[in-house]
Curated annotation (Swiss-Prot):
Name of this chain's protein: NAD(P)H-quinone oxidoreductase subunit I, chloroplastic
Cofactor note: Binds 2 [4Fe-4S] clusters per subunit.
InterPro entries per UniProt: 4Fe4S_Fe-S-bd, 4Fe4S_Fe_S_CS, NADH_quinone_OxRdtase_chainI, NDHI
Organism listed in the record: Solanum lycopersicum (Tomato)
Gene assigned in the entry: ndhI
The entry's keywords: 4Fe-4S, Chloroplast, Iron, Iron-sulfur, Membrane, Metal-binding, NAD, NADP, Plastid, Plastoquinone, Quinone, Repeat, Thylakoid, Translocase
Compartments it resides in: Plastid, Chloroplast thylakoid membrane
Predominant location: plastid
């Protein structure tokens, strides 16, 4: 009879412990019930990107001196810089510049270390395509300025996310 009583007490303790764990989870669920949703309806609503957002790279062909600093600081040696040495003026002349955004990790080193500031990060992040070869942007595609999210009147912009109170 004694083993039966100890098993019953053990069973009661396990039941109380399980009910406590379920109650803790339920209290966490209830604490999240009065918060505002964090998600947005993406194609119809867009967040305004922060000032230091690292989106697609913008390139200004006329400012580039073909120094290849961007290639040296890139962790994956991504930018392709084709240049020709002009012997009469002893300077490099840029022929072609391209970046493959299918490989780019958007670290921003090329923008940060460019001595002539011919590279800059834009707020454009919608780069998805069905063909990965379309992600290889040459100097013409890199030179196009993106349409600002703020200027698009068909999309509702959300300036900031709801603040989470940790009280």
């Amino acid at each position: 009879m004694l083993p039966m009583i100890t098993e019953f007490i053990n069973y009661g303790q396990q039941t109380i412990r399980a009910a406590r764990y379920i109650g803790q989870g339920f209290m966490i669920t209830l604490s999240h019930a009065n918060r505002l949703p964090v998600t947005i309806q993406y194609p119809y609503e867009k967040l305004i990107t922060s000032e230091r957002f690292r989106g697609r790279i913008h390139f200004e062909f006329d400012k580039c001196i073909a120094c290849e600093v961007c290639v040296r600081v890139c962790p994956i040696d991504l930018p392709v810089v084709d240049w020709k040495l002009e012997t009469d003026i002893r300077k490099k002349r840029l022929l072609n510049y391209s970046i493959d955004f299918g490989i780019c990790i958007f670290c921003g080193n090329c923008v940060e270390y460019c001595p002539t500031n011919c590279l800059s990060m834009t707020e454009e992040y919608e780069l998805s395509t069905y063909d990965r070869h379309e992600l290889n942007y040459n100097q013409i595609a890199l030179g196009r300025l993106p349409m600002s999210v703020i200027d698009d009147y068909t999309i509702r912009t959300i300036s900031n996310l709801p603040q989470i109170n940790n009280e």
